[in-house]
């Protein structure tokens, strides 16, 4: 269940219009009428707000953001826009300051409001390092140390996160991501491409639909010229997820105050989430060591007494406490909207990573006996896939075709070749029969069939099929070889020595079986030079041919033997030979069209597959080669480890989402 926006609105103490309640001033609550009701509101607020933020923070701590975008507020601004001052005012601690690039790594600022404690606690964590801080004055030093460790001690930047957690009664419940200030040109010892690098880092965050961009802009500049707002508009042209923060209102030129008011009231550059205006410590106040709490008091007095800006204070659009309330409310609403989609994304990604991890198998055992069993499993899986190919039962994708189906297609083409061969022969019989009759006729009287003429024609037509049969053998062999190689890739791809060994055996056995298959095919065609058919079979075929011709004669669609019409005796002899040829062709084509595919299947699928399976099993005989055969590609174990880490993160994320009390 996800916390609804209505629930958040009901529980939001901002509705009570007591900014100090956010900062934990219990005495003010006691003095105000209706303080009990307000305290109840605070309690409800804590029950709903903190779990939402903690959930997202815990997912970010797990590293889920490496896999999916999480709801966040990213703070961006040009250099010297007052971005650091705003974050200091919200967090109550001093952050790194100075000239040039101060924020050199994304800083995740986790603020946690303590209700019944006065003790301040802090923690800085990055990479595998973590340090607890008990004094707020130590924060700046630790952040600088973290940035130097990650990005070096120069002026470079890094995409690696630093996390600063602050728990205090004086901070709001809020998590922000502070990004480096935008710079246009490199100065001093900054890298020449520093501006491009910073913009790339910022875009990485703000282009995500899950990110609210908090754009910090000085009040004394033309808002349309600021790089930060321009970048936000580029990725969020409708301004749906952008909040504008105006700073330095005390530096606004006289006579331009009304323009600033128009900006804050969303009349100049429209943003759906609107604008806020704040006054933080100036440089002189920092040098004078003005405390942050005192700065908040001065800010309130400034807006209360300002002739133009006091209305903005009354409208809840001014001061840091109002900003804190707005940001917390926006973040919680944003999280609530994002949670259902986030849960689905985590589920889908978890499933995809699980499937991908299965392709990489399990880690290779260290123990020699375990290696043997591991290799046995691998070889057995390979052999089972080969058996499935041999039996035409392999699993294929929606767009793929089984090997046996493709072989059937080749065998069907072979039948067509045979049919076309005989049909083409029938077309030219009228010329050849007369030639053979004149060449081979012996003592027989006209009208008698010359057997040698018949035999010679049969032999020539069948002999013409020998090379197409051998061509089909080579075609099928390549198809089977590729299919077997694909099985090797599927099972052994990550083990390059095992895959290479399997490929070598696939090739060696292919060559041997192809030679044997071709030898038997050519032997078959040698046997086909013996003109033979069982008597009863041949008589039946001849009878059918004659019956068909009689039927065609009745329909006056008899064959045209134009060249032989001058002699009725010759016509009779030629018709007789033609009938015998037709009868023999029918029976021979049945024999050849089935027998040649049988030979090919036997040698190039069944025996080929069986010999390959035996050869792979023989690998198990030499224990000394186990380690060599199971040597993985250099990136395989790294990829498996990476996927396991992702899967572990996503598994924990799913568990935490399932346990979320909302």
UniProtKB/Swiss-Prot annotation:
Region span, G4 motif: 247-250
Binding-site list for GTP: 77-84, 178-182, 247-250
Reported induction: By type I and type III interferons. Isoform 2 is induced by HSV-1.
InterPro entries referenced in this protein's UniProt entry, alphabetically: Dynamin, Dynamin_GTPase, Dynamin_GTPase_CS, Dynamin_N, Dynamin_stalk, G_DYNAMIN_dom, GED, GED_dom
One cellular component term from this protein's GO annotations in UniProt: plasma membrane
Modified residues (N-acetylmethionine): 1
Superkingdom per UniProt: Eukaryota
Keywords tagged on the record: Acetylation, Antiviral defense, Cytoplasm, Endoplasmic reticulum, GTP-binding, Immunity, Innate immunity, Membrane, Nucleotide-binding, Nucleus, Ubl conjugation
Residues covered by region (G1 motif): 77-84
Any one GO molecular-function label of the UniProt entry: identical protein binding
Effect ascribed to mutating residue 83 to M: Loss of GTP-binding. Loss of protection against viral infection
Protein purpose: Interferon-induced dynamin-like GTPase with antiviral activity against a wide range of RNA viruses and some DNA viruses. Its target viruses include negative-stranded RNA viruses and HBV through binding and inactivation of their ribonucleocapsid. May also antagonize reoviridae and asfarviridae replication. Inhibits thogoto virus (THOV) replication by preventing the nuclear import of viral nucleocapsids. Inhibits La Crosse virus (LACV) replication by sequestering viral nucleoprotein in perinuclear complexes, preventing genome amplification, budding, and egress.
Protein name: Interferon-induced GTP-binding protein Mx1
Taxonomic source organism: Homo sapiens (Human)
